[in-house]
């Protein structure tokens, strides 16, 4: 290990290379070991000229994401590496381009607009839950994936005749994600991936996804139909000069919303159900709350009454944040907590570690939804980031939370869930996934 100028330990490229197989499979233990050894912030020399700093320090993270966010953009990990597979949109852009498109897309996710999508959500969720048979064991991860997939597909396109094409789109995004992870975690071998044609093969898949979406958009425009879905909202969105998005931009935004809109939700739902299965006391409290709610009336009103259900989801996302690492790159040299960091320093901020830090949380490894009942939720604002923070906070956070509250509420109103597992095995890819979540369902 090397000492940096400002006394921050630097993990050498040799150490990274020695641990490459572990890192490729699951980087979280490697992160944790280094945080335990070297403190809340350390550097990693990946051997390709990059300056990478890992941190779980709450003050540092708040400074980068909120207080001085103008000096920090998303790094090339997203704008270039991820962007080449899913296009240039809200998730993969910076600066003026991002600001203009955020202003265009944001209105589609206002609570007033989302109220019109709640019926679509509810119908999609109920339809998928019919697959659950009483007194059976299920791996809920694929089940939650199917629910989230149907919700985002119906909310985007409100059409039942697209299922086959949507499945193909899902296959492409999952395949490309695995390739992207290989590139990110093994930067030494990018030249080899290019030489073997692996990257080229996956870029062809991205082109197929774009062509598929282009066809769907053409069909919508040709039909002349007006539907109160997200695609319609994007088609009607206008720049300040009154012009619509270009076709390519529309395709990119739709692909990004599709990709980001179901995977993270499925992950959070799976972890929430597992934790409630492990903690029947909290599960029963959710059941009591849900039993008093009428889902056949005003769905927004129903969701607003499920506060403890929401607390359980919030606590699950603390322990298992879907976006477990957030990246930024500094535009100019900056001083953070008394230390100077050069321009172009890449910051990797571990939400997984921050959300389990004893200086921020009492009994951090314990599942305790009550912690989100007590006092003002703003007190967590400096160290709880399930949807990111600052101007780059996830545009779909309300959409995701409404959906998750409905799913958990509807399941636990009808079923008890149990588990024999003490812990769930995790699979950190672009988002934090469980490997499998086998639960026992029994009718109430």
Q: Could you say what each language-model-derived stretch is?
A:
Residues 264-289, 397-413:
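Cytochrome P450 catalytic-core helices
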């Amino acid at each position: 290990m090397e000492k940096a100028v400002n006394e921050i330990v630097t993990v050498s490229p040799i150490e990274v290379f020695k641990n490459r197989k572990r890192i490729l499979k699951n980087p979280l233990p490697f992160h944790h070991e280094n945080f335990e050894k070297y403190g809340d912030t350390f550097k990693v020399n990946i051997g390709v000229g990059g300056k990478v700093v890992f941190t779980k320090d709450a003050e540092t993270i708040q400074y980068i994401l909120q207080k001085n966010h103008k000096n920090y953009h998303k790094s090339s990990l997203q704008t270039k590496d991820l962007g080449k597979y899913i296009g240039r949109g809200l998730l993969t852009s910076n600066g003026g381009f991002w600001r203009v498109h955020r202003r265009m897309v944001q209105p589609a996710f206002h609570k007033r607009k989302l109220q019109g999508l709640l019926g679509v959500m509810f119908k999609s969720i109920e339809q998928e839950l019919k697959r659950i048979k009483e007194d059976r064991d299920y791996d809920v991860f694929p089940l939650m994936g199917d629910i989230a997939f149907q919700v985002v597909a119906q909310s985007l396109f409100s059409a039942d005749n697209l299922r086959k094409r949507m499945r193909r789109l899902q296959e492409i995004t999952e395949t490309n994600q695995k390739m992207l992870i290989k590139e990110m975690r093994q930067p030494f071998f990018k030249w080899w991936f290019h030489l073997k044609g692996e990257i080229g093969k996956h870029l062809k898949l991205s082109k197929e996804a774009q062509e598929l979406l282009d066809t769907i958009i053409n069909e919508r425009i040709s039909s002349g139909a007006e539907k109160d879905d997200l695609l319609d909202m994007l088609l009607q969105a206008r720049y300040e000069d009154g012009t619509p998005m270009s076709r390519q931009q529309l395709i990119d935004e739709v692909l990004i919303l599709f990709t980001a809109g179901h995977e993270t939700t499925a992950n959070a739902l799976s972890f929430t159900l597992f934790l409630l299965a492990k903690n029947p006391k909290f599960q029963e409290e959710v059941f009591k709350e849900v039993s008093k709610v009428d889902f056949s009336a005003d769905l927004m009103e129903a969701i607003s009454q499920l506060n403890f259900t929401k607390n359980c989801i919030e606590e699950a996302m603390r322990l298992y944040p879907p976006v477990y690492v957030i990246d930024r790159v500094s535009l100019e040299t900056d001083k953070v907590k008394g230390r100077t960091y050069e321009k172009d320093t890449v910051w990797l901020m571990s939400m997984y570690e921050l959300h389990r830090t004893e200086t921020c949380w009492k009994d951090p490894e314990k599942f305790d939804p009550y912690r989100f009942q007590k006092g003002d939720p703003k007190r967590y604002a400096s160290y709880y980031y399930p949807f990111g923070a600052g101007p780059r906070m996830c545009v779909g956070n309300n959409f995701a939370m409404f959906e998750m509250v409905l799913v958990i509420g509807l399941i636990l109103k009808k079923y008890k869930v149990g588990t024999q597992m003490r812990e769930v095995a995790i699979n950190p890819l672009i988002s934090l996934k469980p490997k499998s979540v086998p639960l026992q369902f029994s009718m109430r």
